[in-house]
């Protein structure tokens, strides 16, 4: 009776049940593949984490200054989740090594900055293109038509802005240690400016002994603009018009500064031709600009007049240079030394450089970090100055600032004669330090009586000698 009866849906249910049985192996294989992929992902992330840890003990390969902002927390493609770097435009990064085409390993140059994954220029360019495509897809046609109706800027200006926007790279390669450059209170080559800056050079040489390289640069570094060095046509034009420095000489000096910075020592430039921050703004040096500021023009005039008629003849030029520096916005400088006393100005600069030193040196223990460059693993083959032992190479001896003894010797006076003649010949002691020849002894050969950081038993004695021989103006300004 029921054999020929039809039960609706029975065949379908049977078929569905059969299909479910046959589809189970496929589901199991999908789960297995997903587990394999997850296992492989965890293995890759573990290896990336290990490489990140090993990079902490590696030397800095090079440094960059950022032109864009980036948030690593939002990047899901970071090799180790949560280990992506965050930075803003104009930050500085130390690059340790290349992880892949899309990622570097390095750290943000700041106190306590940890090792992290850094997007390579290729990855940042890829992110930028994706953002542009997304913006085009979400663009409103009506708004695009409105732009045509608005008053547009001149074509030349619009093209110039578009060209600048297109050619700005995400990173600029800069020295591993930003070189320190002093400007002010007026023009270099004149006695007041030279004697005030020399007092700071002498202080830094003693205060950061073993951690600093002070080198003189006579080439015109303002010619080292990236657009000039990368454009053969512009190089030829400037080569013909420049009597002071050739482009080849400038390029050589830039390379030498980069090599000095590889040691991760502080680098201070005694740059003869740099008197304004704008001169170095478009170079790849990314310097720390220190403004030695006299707060009152009347005080500067009095100081110039006190140096005699030879300096009075150039009073107008020096005051014009002073005015240009004072008119600069404060953000043009990294440090402004406007203290009334030499000791206060020195301590201000020293505090800034100590913070910068800690920012550039990773807190993790590294072998030879505070020692000479030759003691840092992996850097010996990179040194411009060659193999270094107890003594400096001839090139380094030529580049370092002369010691106090050499400066005194070049002025044909011994320290004993200086002390005897000091009472009535203060103004005659000064010899512009920019007239020195390069064949001077190493700056590391200090006489004990000239040290600022001597033992406690000799501290007061040395402090008195330094106060007596300092070339800083006696005026309180």
UniProtKB/Swiss-Prot annotation:
GO terms for molecular function: calcium channel regulator activity; voltage-gated calcium channel activity. CDD domains: SH3_CACNB3. InterPro entries: CAB1-4_N_A-dom, CACNB3_SH3, GK/Ca_channel_bsu, P-loop_NTPase, SH3-like_dom_sf, SH3_domain, VDCC_L_b3su, VDCC_L_bsu. Residues 195-345 are annotated as: Mediates interaction with the alpha subunit. The lineage of its organism: Eukaryota, Metazoa, Chordata, Craniata, Vertebrata. Pfam families: Guanylate_kin (PF00625), VGCC_beta4Aa_N (PF12052). Residues 1-52, 129-170, 385-477 are annotated as: Disordered. This is Voltage-dependent L-type calcium channel subunit beta-3. GO terms for biological process: calcium ion transmembrane transport via high voltage-gated calcium channel; positive regulation of high voltage-gated calcium channel activity. Belongs to the calcium channel beta subunit family. Disulfide bonds: none annotated. The keyword Ion transport applies. Component of a calcium channel complex consisting of a pore-forming alpha subunit (CACNA1C) and the ancillary subunits CACNB3 and CACNA2D1. The channel complex contains alpha, beta, gamma and delta subunits in a 1:1:1:1 ratio. Interacts with CACNA2D4. Interacts with FASLG. Interacts with CBARP; prevents the interaction of CACNB3 with the alpha subunit CACNA1C thereby negatively regulating the activity of the corresponding calcium channel. GO terms for cellular component: cytoplasm; L-type voltage-gated calcium channel complex. It comes from Oryctolagus cuniculus (Rabbit). Coiled coil: none annotated. Residues 387-399, 456-477 have a biased composition (Basic and acidic residues). The modification Phosphoserine is found at residues 152, 393. Regulatory subunit of the voltage-gated calcium channel that gives rise to L-type calcium currents. Increases CACNA1B peak calcium current and shifts the voltage dependencies of channel activation and inactivation. Increases CACNA1C peak calcium current and shifts the voltage dependencies of channel activation and inactivation. The keyword Cytoplasm applies. PANTHER family: VOLTAGE-DEPENDENT CALCIUM CHANNEL BETA SUBUNIT.
